[in-house]
């Protein structure tokens, strides 16, 4: 599964990816991965532009829109972006290392 997508455009290479921080910003802006199918006209542009935030935060919306409009296989692109987004969310719950030596533990108490 892809962690990044690279897009060459007008002599520049754009690296698209998501981080916990960019995912959080997207959610605060109203993005919901669960609404991707029911509100595609809103959520797909938010998903695509959100992927620029980690490495290209100052890219203008007009440039992002031109890049998107010129790309082929948009269904494949949106699928890959959605998987990358979801992977970033899952890092909040994943145990990075099975070896927990030295890491704090937790316990539920009554």
Q: How should each PLM-predicted stretch be described?
A:
Residues 19:
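Residue-level signal for threonine
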Residues 53-56:
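Extended, low-hydrophobicity segments enriched in charged/polar residues
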Residues 14-16:
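Short, isolated positions in well-ordered beta-strands
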Residues 23-29:
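Short active-site loop/helix that positions an aromatic residue
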Residues 1-9, 31-34, 38, 42, ...:
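Charged interaction scaffolds used for protein-protein
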């Amino acid at each position: 599964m892809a962690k990044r997508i690279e897009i060459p455009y007008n002599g520049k290479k754009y690296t698209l990816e998501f981080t916990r921080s960019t995912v959080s910003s997207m959610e605060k802006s109203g993005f919901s991965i669960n609404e991707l199918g029911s509100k595609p006209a809103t959520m797909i542009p938010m998903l695509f532009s959100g992927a620029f935030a980690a490495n290209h935060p100052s890219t203008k919306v007009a440039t992002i829109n031109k890049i998107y409009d010129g790309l082929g296989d948009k269904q494949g692109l949106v699928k890959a972006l959605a998987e990358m987004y979801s992977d970033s969310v899952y890092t909040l719950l994943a145990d990075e290392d099975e070896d927990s030596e030295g890491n704090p533990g937790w316990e539920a108490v009554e």
